[in-house]
Every structure is written in C-alpha cells, then in structure tokens.
C-alpha cells in the first residue's frame, strides 16, 4: 500500500485545522503522512495534542519566515515528504473518507488524478461543484481545469511535482501548479465524485477583504510569465490558456466591482450566479 504524503499549508488556522486533520485521519486509505507547514509560527502539533490527537503520522515544518505564503509553505512540506504520492489539503477544507482510496488507483495508472471539488458554506450547504453532476469520468486538460473556476486538489505521483510551487506567486499558485502538473503528466484523470469540501468562509484567502486585489496582482504576474514562455504548458494550448487567464482576470475585476458595491458574497457564490446568468 503506497505511502501518500499530504501537504497542508497553515497560516493562522487554529479555528479550522483540527477538522481538516480529522478528515485525513478518517481516510479509508491508512498509509499516509500529513505534513503541516506552519507559516505563522504556530505549533500545530501542540494544538493537536491539547485536543487529544496523538498520531505519529502527523509531522510539522515551519517556513523560514512568517507569512512566506502558501507556495513556500507547501514547498517546505514537499521537501519533507517521504511518500510515493503527494496530495494537497488546505487547513480550512475537508475530505470525504474515500478521497485517497478512490483516487489512488487512478493516480497509479496515469500519475495524476482529481475528484470533483465541491464548494460549500461552513454549514454544509452546497454552492457548486467543479463539474456538473453526471459528468463522465475521463481525462481533462489544463484548459478544462481552468475554466471551471473551482480549485482542484489532485493526487499525484511524486516525480511529477518538479520544482514544486512557484514561490513568487501568493494567489492562483495552485492553478499554475496544477497546470504544470498536467503538462508533465499529459492529462489529469477526473473522478467526477465530490470528495473534497472546499469551504467558503468570509475570512478565507479568496474571500477576505482585499482578495480580489491580490488576485489582480497575481494575474499581473502570471500573464507576463505566460507571454515569456516561463510556464510549462502544452504549446498547442498556449493561445487558449492565455485567453482563459485574461477572461479570469476580467471576471475577477467584475467580482471586485461587486464587492465594492456591496452586492457580492463569496467568490464561489459570485461565480455560481454568473454561470446561472450565462445559462
């Protein structure tokens, strides 16, 4: 049974991380290690101990400087990882118990697999899934992944991680990481079952005050990286991916305008409304 290393960046995550950890401890696949990358100086293993969680599969590393960012934190976790496969879980999200066991056969075959991320409210009310219910299992490319607007949390063969996350990016770093994974693997295998709960909180990175401005700054970094050829993307998709990022930038600016007008909730709620209007 392969060892899976789970990467968890944690920044001021005391209120949510225990639930995320318990969702890992509840996995049907038992051979895993969870590497918590503390980016705020907090001792999350001590927090676990204080709450009755004593599990030798939990490990922790701290970033060199507080608030180094999610890319740097996850890269610290990758450097500690001992597993044959890697997976990513944010400290404010949760997995369903079959997440790893369902994706592992697909990742062993193709190298890279994901489930159908479900965006939900903290009370469990569904907002949207990355792909419609009833989507056929199969391979997806980078453009398909990007156009969902919902994060993907894959299980991947370790060698596909390359140099890890782009440390200079503090927003949309997961999109770029996944895009480059797909370029190395050739495609990502989709299991259209919602096994990751992407929990939408007002204070999360994508919804907190200033989030749309941070996204705008990230797009200002990413588009020149695409133009210069610094990112590993399939040549046949370069034009379409550049256009998709430009579209995402326009959508983010529209979200920013709605936020400033006081008419927007979370980004995922805004995105779901935009989809309904488009239909």
Residue spans of the language-model regions?
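A conserved hydrophobic helix/loop-capping motif in glycosyltransferases and polysaccharide synthases
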Residues: 4-16, 20, 27, 37-39
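Conserved nucleotide-sugar donor-binding catalytic segment
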Residues: 137-219
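Glycine-rich, basic loop-to-helix element that forms the pyrophosphate-binding segment
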Residues: 63-81
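Short aromatic/hydrophobic "clamp" motif used to bind/position activated sugar donors
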Residues: 86
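Cell-envelope/extracellular polymer assembly enzymes that use nucleotide-activated donors
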Residues: 2-5, 23, 33, 176
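Conserved donor NDP-sugar-binding/catalytic core segment of glycosyltransferases
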Residues: 98-127
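Catalytic core of nucleotide-sugar-dependent glycosyltransferases
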Residues: 194-201, 207-234, 257-277
């Amino acid at each position: 049974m392969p060892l899976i290393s789970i990467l968890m960046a944690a920044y001021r995550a005391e209120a949510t991380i225990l639930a995320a950890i318990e969702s890992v401890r509840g996995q049907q696949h038992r051979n895993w290690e969870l590497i918590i990358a503390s980016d705020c100086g907090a001792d999350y293993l001590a927090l676990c101990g204080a709450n009755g969680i004593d599990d030798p599969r939990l490990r922790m590393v701290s970033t060199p400087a507080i608030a180094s960012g999610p890319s740097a934190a996850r890269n610290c976790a990758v450097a500690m990882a001992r597993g044959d496969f890697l997976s990513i879980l944010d400290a404010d999200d949760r997995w369903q118990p079959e997440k790893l066991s369902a994706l592992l056969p697909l990742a062993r075959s193709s190298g890279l697999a994901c489930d159908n991320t479900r965006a939900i409210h903290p009370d469990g009310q569904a907002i949207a899934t990355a792909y419609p219910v009833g989507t056929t299992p199969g391979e997806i490319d980078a453009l398909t992944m990007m156009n969902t607007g919902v994060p993907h949390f894959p299980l991947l063969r370790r060698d596909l991680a390359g140099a890890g996350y782009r440390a200079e990016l503090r927003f949309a770093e997961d999109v770029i990481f996944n895009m480059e994974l797909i370029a190395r693997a050739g495609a990502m295998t989709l299991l259209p079952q919602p096994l990751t709960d992407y929990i939408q909180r007002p204070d999360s990175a994508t919804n907190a005050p200033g989030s749309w401005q941070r996204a705008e700054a990230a797009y200002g970094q990413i588009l020149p990286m695409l133009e210069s050829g610094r990112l590993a993307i399939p040549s046949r998709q370069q034009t379409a991916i550049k256009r998709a990022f430009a579209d995402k930038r326009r959508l983010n600016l529209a979200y920013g305008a709605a936020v400033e007008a006081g008419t927007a909730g979370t980004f995922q709620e805004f995105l779901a409304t935009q989809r309904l209007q488009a239909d």
